Amino acid sequence: MPDTDLLSLQLEHVGVLQNRYEQVLEDHGYDGLLISSGAAPMCYGDDQSWHFQGYGPFLHWTGLAGFEHAWLLIRKGKKPLLSLHQPVDFWHASLELPQEPWLEKFELRFSESPSAPELEGMSQLAVVGDPALLAGLPGDENPGALCNALDETRVHKTAYEIACLAQANKLAMAGHQAARDAFLAGASEFEINLAYQRATQQREVDAPYNSIIGVNEHAGILHYQYYDTAAPVKSRSLLIDAGVRFRGYCSDITRTTTGVEEGRFSALVHGLEQLQFRLCKMVAPGVDYLDIHRKTHFGIAALLSAAGIVDGLSDEELVSEGLTRAFFPHGIGHFLGVQVHDVAGKPVAPPADAPFLRLTRTLEPGMVVTIEPGLYFIPSLLEPLLSGPLGHHINRPLLDELQGCGGIRIEDNVVVTDTGCRNLTREAEA
């Protein structure tokens, strides 16, 4: 059982959610809200199902990531009703409900049927979840304004949520260290993944997302999804982007490790890490997240010039001409919570110069964000530069040398505090 402090924080968390949800129901004219946990759909033409990922609002309340066909009914002035599906089944094991104090805050029911519980005494009901599971239920299905308001309840994390995220970081960092050790010992991508799973005691299907484990040029594929079973003749670099789910909450951490005799690339990794430290320290109340993203591009420009990858252009010119976007094509980060890319990050669309930015808000206490600058050598992005009017400013021989290392990304999970920030990842790494 978790420590008593965490369990006490969870009791407070449930109380906070009850107040937040009752206010949302009041604001939108509903008596109650029925939340589906979801269920894994079946593969077409097969008797196997896809991997199950629980629905965010259900996880927000319960943290029960593996419970399919469960239902949560929120009612004003009453205990939430938690209905769990427990069929009589000799093919599969049933998940056990943890015997923890937070359950006292709920009315519990168990059902052999996957159907929703009977709904009585509510004239205005909303139901949210996968539409395929809501068919035939009374009430308004996934009303847009209400769903947006529910997303907003997840923007500012409770103390319990931050504690869960901190533990998810601690568990993940043990995996990252094991992955680094395996890489330096000459392991393949597949073996590195096994080392990560062993250290985190987590199956692939239980992870918050598929671990990205790229060796050498594979580190330049942003969401590289395969694992080579044979190690390369020379292991020059490792990029691992991997997390852990703890009580429903996700960590999302990236580290880049260099092999021996990679002096130029190692210097770039060190330079990007120093930039990442500075960017993390920018996280504070009142800071526009877009400003952190744009600051990153100027930092990337300085690294490119210092490394001799480009010359003859100022940092301002490298940014304004779009050269840095070829080396750093994604956003600086996103919200983090019960989903890796947590909700409500883009109340306004990202600007044209940052189309992939997942967070466009001014930071406030209680928000949790990732800070993940990258510097990559991606042929499809660099070839247009090399053949364009600014190509003569780029050191092609050096670029050719570095492309075999793929790229660099360094990512931490950072809490916005009342006065600045708290870096959960560096705490776990210490």
What are the roles of these predicted feature ranges?
Residues 1-430:
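Active-site neighborhoods and metal-handling regions in enzymes and metal-associated proteins
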